[in-house]
């Protein structure tokens, strides 16, 4: 069919407008749901301020800490994990073929001795060279194994884990003393909960001592400051809104808790994806729903884990490209979840939404800007029509970011200094006018890399000294 050029312009204009209206409309709905969930969480949080009294019914937890060339930070990470406020847990460090002396540092710091453990290798991994146990901390073990990537290291940790719950922790994560208690509560309250994720915030600009957060602050540089706003929106709204529907597809690998048996039955973490954390969650949805087994995957909105954000464009670009590749791989490997007969809201709502707006979103957004601006410059589009498009594409995005910031201020209120709110408002503006478009471009590159690129297992960002908040 040979449509006139003007008809193609009209079609393109309507398509991009409808796309962005649908995108922002769904996010608005998720926002409204999230507000209710946060309100309920805040009432429970008030009870948590009372002195901790453990009932003795708490399920013991295995903390898995995969490490590859983490010599500079591994001791602080392990020390902080050993000081968590929880009745019974073990810490398992998995040294994944490090070449920088990580194992030797652990041996000296924690008096490691060979441990003749009998491990059930229910999940296939690269060869385990040795297992050590600390003479000073009986609940600390270290697995030394050949390099196989983060997912392979986590599988080795699951094989050695003694407890029914396990929690993967990144080596650069900063926890709070009650982080385990908050994340494990849903597992204790509901036996059908098989996975729980927590809200992740950025440690850039915060004061950290002994591996624990002492004071919350904002980073002084613009790039990580923008990411603070981005994380607020992503965790407070982008994920929490799916929980009442049992349709949460992402639990951050930075700090997530799982029941061990369903994960082992599902085959553990896949080693052929850079998004092993999301892929496992989507696969659990697919397997549990297909088997018609009752299950829930939940989210704890409390800020219980703090991680370092990239402070340079090169590291941030690499991170976002990996995330987009991981998203594409997770959806592709579990495509049978889409519109499955028993898939529920995860397969009928969250999965198609993620394909349309998260996976293909960068392509449509970049294409929309290019199409509408080109049509305007060529005289096919009025300035009024262009402004309407920009308002829908950018104005609603600005509103959503502002609502995330507002919810943070009304609930957790972590950023207390007078200058913090103006700084966050500035970052909110910059995020939507420049950063968002650059991020979409990186994500588009990541999508193309999934189609044509090579594998990459361990993703690294350039580490900085822990920044201190300004006085």
Role assignments for model-derived ranges:
Residues 1-57, 239, 368-374, 402-407, ...:
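N-terminal membrane-anchoring/stem segments of glycan-assembly enzymes
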Residues 26, 115-155, 159, 163, ...:
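Long helical/loop segments within the catalytic core of UDP-sugar-dependent glycosyltransferases
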Residues 30-88, 104-107:
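N-terminal signal-anchor transmembrane helix
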Residues 53, 353-451:
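Membrane-embedded multi-pass helical conduit in multi-pass membrane proteins
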Residues 59-62, 90, 264, 279:
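Cell-envelope/extracellular polymer assembly enzymes that use nucleotide-activated donors
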Residues 79-143:
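Acidic donor-binding segment of Leloir-type glycosyltransferases
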Residues 166:
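Short aromatic/hydrophobic "clamp" motif used to bind/position activated sugar donors
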Residues 262-265, 273-298:
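A short, conserved alpha-helix in the catalytic core of glycosyltransferases
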